[in-house]
């Protein structure tokens, strides 16, 4: 994103309940008015299968300061989910040359309080070093999934990430951790 434009000024496609574009709005307006838009969630794992977990900075526009087990963000106006997944993964992980994230599934997130977005979930393997954006990430680490599970009751996680994680676990079914990708 252009350094002169704040994240609140980013233009997003506004979509209906079937994920069809019905208009556009500034990101800040979309959140303030509860307009449905698009987001990507990227499940990033290292070669050992550990999950990238991070704590969001207190300056984030939405859900400041909790932890998240996904990297990702909003899909810009006219941008595809696939392109947004790669862009967000590279930006938030601070890693270039990542393989294109693999699309897993899509769901409609709605917290019932005006936060609603179509959410495309992806997975990517991160072979090299990461250097997350200090503006986005206050802490990070690659955790074994069993440790992540243990932290769910101890750390505050973003609600949309928890929803995506529950759906990811259901999507994987009984095959267990590490079965995706």
Swiss-Prot record:
Protein source organism: Streptomyces coelicolor (strain ATCC BAA-471 / A3(2) / M145)
Protein name per its UniProtKB record: Uncharacterized Nudix hydrolase SCO1686
Pfam families: NUDIX
Motif Nudix box in this chain: 72-94
Binding site for Mg(2+): 88, 92
Swiss-Prot/TrEMBL cofactor(s): Mg(2+)
UniProt xrefs under InterPro entries: NUDIX_hydrolase-like_dom_sf, NUDIX_hydrolase_CS, NUDIX_hydrolase_dom, NUDIX_hydrolase_YfcD_pred
CDD domains: NUDIX_Hydrolase
Ranges where the Nudix hydrolase domain occurs: 35-175
Lineage, top ranks: Bacteria, Bacillati, Actinomycetota, Actinomycetes, Kitasatosporales
């Amino acid at each position: 994103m252009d350094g002169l434009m704040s994240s609140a000024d980013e233009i997003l496609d506004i979509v209906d309940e079937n994920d069809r574009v019905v208009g556009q709005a500034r990101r800040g307006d979309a959140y303030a008015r509860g307009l449905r838009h698009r987001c990507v969630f990227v499940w990033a794992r290292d070669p050992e299968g550990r999950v990238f977990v991070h704590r969001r900075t207190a300056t984030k526009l939405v859900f400041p300061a909790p932890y998240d087990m996904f990297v990702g963000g909003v899909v810009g106006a006219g941008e595809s989910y696939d392109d947004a997944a790669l862009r967000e993964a590279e930006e938030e992980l601070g890693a270039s040359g990542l393989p294109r994230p693999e699309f897993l599934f899509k769901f409609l997130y709605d917290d019932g309080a005006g936060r609603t977005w179509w959410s495309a979930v992806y997975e990517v393997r991160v072979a090299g070093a990461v250097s997350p954006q200090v503006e986005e990430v206050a802490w990070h680490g690659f955790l074994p999934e069993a440790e992540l599970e243990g932290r769910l009751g101890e750390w505050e996680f973003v609600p949309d990430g928890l929803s995506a994680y529950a759906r990811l676990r259901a999507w994987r079914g009984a095959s267990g951790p590490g079965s995706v990708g």
